[in-house]
């Protein structure tokens, strides 16, 4: 019998789903997904939607808490939704993420591949090097920073996000105070009025340099010079301030037009010893210390020799390939974002003449570039894949197979698509040897996975 809306069930949560919701089963065996619960919870659950084979519920009352539960130390963790696992002990969170990776490779990939023990993040809180605060108004009508409530564009004020370094929260609050003082209004999606849409901040984990980027609907910011002086006096680590123009009615945060208000327009940092320049459009892992663990594993799986050519598809600003440049004969990087490719070239140059001479970076779609390179007869020894969440399309994977690299290392932010793509490669001459989960996003549902694949034919 289908479950009814508002029906109350007493359920025991068995595990977490890939989106961080608790999973339980009704008396009839129907799966029920309940956000904000933990494995081992006994809970009174209210059904909000039945979809036939599964249903969604909300926590009505926690009857017996799981031993894995911890007090939630953020007052807006629920409505904000960014920290979907903030109620879980970190050891339990790691177990859940480990299980989600194992489940993806078994259920989606159909692969019985060894999934190694997950590598934890060195920092569980304050680990992010980037934040994009939407700017709205609080209950008193004053400008405020916050985050969108789940599946809405309603801003939940959040003056102290626990995932961000404290200084980034302080800068966001200081900017809002300046906006209030000067009568600068946040952008309102409904009316289309207002100026400031987002506050985009980056901080170098090793350098400490901070970039401030104000995303506005037009290119002129009132009292910009006064703002720059005030910010630099209060926060000496700020090394550049930019204004990004986004006048479109869109969910995309950044527009294509940047104006430098102060400094060089970028910050500098290092990742695995690679010097990097980061602007507003640079793709960069948000957890630097955990990313260094991730890239270290990728280098181990690549098993490079000094005679090898390394092809780095979806290379971003070049960090993962450049971190291995001293181990190979040649490095070729491909990325579709022009600014990222320019940064990759500059990063290679800053590593010295020897690295710059052996490195080539091309601005192109990774799939199209792989197809073209395969047609030209390129045969790299190692291919590094680091695609977006949607994974690789079949044309890209086919091109990789035609190039016949000795090894493929697949770095993924989505274990489901990694499992799918690894299964395709398994059917086309490659053996998935092992998978290493790495936690780059503590307190959230997200987990990275690295797949080591060896050519069999």
Regions inferred by a protein language model and the residue ranges of each:
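Hydrophobic beta-strand signal
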Residues: 44-46, 132, 311
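Short, conserved phosphate/pyrophosphate- and ester-handling motifs at nucleotide-, phospho-/glycolipid
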Residues: 40, 164, 287
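Extended interfacial segments that mediate partner engagement and assembly in macromolecular machines
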Residues: 60-72, 78-186, 206, 221
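Flexible loop/N-cap segments at domain edges
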Residues: 199
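Terminal RNA-binding accessory module
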Residues: 1-72, 76, 361, 367
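Rossmann-like S-adenosyl-L-methionine
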Residues: 2-7, 12, 18, 219, ...
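Structural signature of eukaryotic scaffold interfaces centered on beta-propeller domains
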Residues: 202-204
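Short, acidic/hydrophobic/Gly-rich beta-strand patch recurrent on exposed beta strands
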Residues: 22-27, 146-149, 213-215, 344
């Amino acid at each position: 019998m289908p479950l009814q809306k508002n029906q109350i069930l007493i359920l025991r949560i068995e595990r977490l789903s890939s989106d961080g919701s608790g999973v339980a089963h009704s008396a009839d065996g129907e799966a029920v997904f309940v956000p904000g619960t933990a494995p081992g919870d006994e809970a009174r659950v209210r059904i909000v939607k039945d979809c036939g084979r599964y249903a969604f519920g909300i926590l009505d009352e926690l009857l017996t808490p799981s031993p894995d539960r911890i007090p939630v130390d953020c007052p807006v963790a629920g409505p904000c939704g960014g920290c979907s696992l903030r109620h879980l002990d970190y050891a339990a969170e790691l177990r859940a993420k480990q299980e989600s990776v194992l489940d993806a490779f078994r259920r989606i990939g159909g692969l019985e591949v060894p999934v190694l023990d997950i590598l934890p993040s060195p920092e569980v809180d304050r680990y992010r090097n980037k934040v994009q605060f939407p700017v709205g108004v609080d209950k008193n009508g004053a400008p405020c920073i916050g985050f969108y409530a789940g599946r809405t564009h309603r801003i939940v004020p959040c003056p102290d996000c626990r995932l961000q370094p404290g200084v980034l929260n302080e800068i966001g609050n200081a900017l809002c105070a300046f906006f209030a003082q000067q009568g600068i209004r946040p952008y309102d999606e409904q009316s289309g009025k207002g100026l400031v849409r987002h506050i985009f901040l980056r901080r170098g984990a090793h350098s400490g340099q901070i970039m401030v980027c104000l995303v506005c609907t037009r290119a002129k910011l009132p009292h910009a010079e006064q703002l720059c002086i005030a910010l630099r006096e209060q926060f000496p680590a700020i090394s550049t301030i930019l204004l990004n123009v986004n006048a479109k009615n869109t969910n995309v945060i950044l527009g294509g037009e940047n104006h430098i208000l102060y400094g060089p327009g970028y910050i500098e940092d290092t990742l695995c010893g690679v010097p990097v320049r980061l602007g507003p459009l640079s793709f960069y892992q948000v957890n630097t210390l955990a990313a260094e663990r991730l890239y270290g594993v990728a280098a181990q799986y690549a098993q490079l020799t000094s005679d090898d050519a390394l092809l780095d598809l979806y290379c971003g600003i070049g960090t993962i390939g450049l971190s291995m440049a001293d181990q190979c004969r040649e490095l070729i990087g491909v990325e579709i974002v022009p600014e990222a490719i320019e940064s990759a070239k500059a990063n290679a140059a800053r590593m010295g003449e020897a690295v710059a001479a052996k490195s080539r970076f091309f601005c192109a779609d990774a799939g199209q570039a792989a197809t073209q390179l395969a047609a030209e007869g390129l045969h790299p020894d190692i291919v590094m894949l680091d695609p977006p969440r949607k994974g690789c399309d079949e044309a890209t994977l086919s091109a990789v197979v035609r190039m016949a690299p000795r090894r493929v290392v697949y770095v993924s932010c989505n274990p489901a698509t990694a499992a799918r793509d690894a299964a395709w490669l398994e059917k086309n001459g490659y053996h998935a040897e092992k998978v290493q989960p790495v936690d780059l996003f503590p307190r959230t549902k997200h987990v990275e996975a690295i797949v080591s694949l060896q050519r069999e034919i």
